UniProtKB/Swiss-Prot annotation:
Record-linked SUPFAM superfamilies: WD40 repeat-like
WD repeat copies, ranges: 64-106, 116-155, 163-206, 208-250, 258-298, 320-358
Cited InterPro entries: WD40/YVTN_repeat-like_dom_sf, WD40_repeat_dom_sf, WD40_rpt
Function as written in the Swiss-Prot or TrEMBL entry: Key assembly factor specifically required for the stability of axonemal dynein heavy chains in cytoplasm.
GO BP of this protein: apoptotic process; axonemal dynein complex assembly
Source taxon at top rank: Eukaryota
Origin species: Xenopus tropicalis
Keywords noted in UniProt: Apoptosis, Cytoplasm, Repeat, WD repeat
Annotated compartments: Dynein axonemal particle
Subunit structure, interactors included: Interacts with PIH1D1; the interaction associates DNAAF10 with the R2TP complex. Interacts with several dynein axonemal assembly factors.
Name of this protein: Dynein axonemal assembly factor 10
GO-annotated cellular components: dynein axonemal particle
Length: 358
């Protein structure tokens, strides 16, 4: 990639101003539509569905909800139904049919406080086993839900009695490569990262990255754990090689100081797991490529396998706004198409070029 013209370019295709605070956006699988959720000025929540038509974003659906909606996922829904699961400021977990979004098809009082983050697995053709949703909240708990089971979570990871409750900011499923195996990774405001094994209900690994963990994502949910990216408050992100776990040192990792402000989100390209985008608090997006080391593991002095971290290279960066880009989502179907939202009350559809050349 010698000349600038050979590098991927990040092009703003559509910019759509809205009249509310945007918190999350998701592409609707197998469509040219996306959904946005957020907070109206009068304190209620809003859910909107847009479709890309002739270079414009056309509003198809809008529904107002009692509580502001913080996060959403299609990860536990079938490709036929494409139901959106959301978490709101009241601690409620709801699942919506976007064709008729007036009343939820599933509802549970999930948490005592705001649901900050949500993820799903077992739906949209990703991950083996039953569909499940995970939610993380300010109340310090991480809960796993089966949308076929009402009211009670199938797993509840909460601090032990006497432990301080930390604000859970981000959750991610991974390792769902067969019907038995499944992991949840959770990140907290004090820099803790915890990896929960749902098969034997234990903490498989934990670490601390010294700054609040804003976003976590495995490069793929439906394979044996490969890589995990964690982003943090001080403009730094960490990439953990999850293939080799050392008994005392854990997983090998590398870190990169990229943005000069909080890195709000990381999203891996669905069509290439070694390419990912980070979104920053100064309104910028950075596109990265992970390079594996020559050998991913080596023996330590006691002849025990330990991982070797790789490196990242910056492919492209662009500043879209003066406000934080709070969420972004790649299209699962069209390589290089993505949608992002910012606190400048604008949703943007972007096209990233030349990704097939990487």
């Amino acid at each position: 990639m010698s000349s600038p013209l050979e590098k991927p370019q990040i092009i703003a295709h559509v910019q759509k101003p809205v009249t509310y605070t945007l918190f999350d956006c998701k592409w609707i699988p197998c469509s040219a539509k996306f959904v946005c959720v957020g907070n109206l000025a009068r304190g209620s929540g809003v859910l909107q569905v847009y479709e890309i038509q002739q270079g414009e974003a056309k509003l198809l659906q809008e529904a107002e909800k009692p509580k502001p909606i913080k996060c959403g996922t299609f990860g536990a829904s079938s490709l036929q139904q494409r139901y959106l699961a959301t978490g709101d400021f009241g601690g409620n977990l709801n699942i919506w049919n976007l064709e008729a979004p007036d009343t939820p098809v599933y509802s549970a009082k999930g948490h005592n406080e705001i649901i900050n983050c949500i993820d799903g697995v077992g739906g949209v053709g990703i991950g083996e086993g039953a569909p499940e949703i995970v939610t993380g909240s300010r109340d310090g708990t991480v809960k796993v839900w089966d949308p076929r089971q009402k009211d009670t979570p199938v797993a509840n990871m909460e601090p032990a009695a006497g432990e301080t409750k930390r604000d859970c900011w981000t959750v991610a499923f991974g390792h769902a490569y067969n019907e038995q195996e499944r992991l949840v990774c959770a990140g907290y405001d004090n820099g803790d990262i915890k990896l929960f094994d749902l098969r034997n209900m234990s903490v498989r690994w934990e670490t601390n990255i010294k700054n609040g963990v804003c976003s976590l994502e495995f490069d793929r949910k439906d394979i044996v754990m490969n890589k995990l990216v964690a982003t943090s408050l001080e403009g730094k992100f960490h990439v953990f090689d999850m293939r080799t776990q050392h008994p005392s040192k854990g997983f090998a990792s590398m870190s990169e100081k990229a943005h000069k402000s909080t890195i709000w989100q990381v999203r891996h390209l669905p069509q290439n797991r070694d390419v990912f985008m980070t979104s920053g608090g100064a309104g910028n997006l950075h596109l990265w490529k992970y390079e594996y080391p020559a050998q991913r593991s080596r023996k330590d002095s006691d002849d025990v396998d330990m991982g070797v971290a790789g490196s990242v290279s910056l492919l492209q960066n662009v500043t879209l706004s003066t406000q934080p880009i709070s969420s972004m989502d790649w299209s699962p179907d069209k390589k290089g198409l993505c949608v992002c939202t910012s606190f400048d009350q604008t949703v943007r559809v972007l096209i990233v070029t030349k990704l097939n050349k990487l």
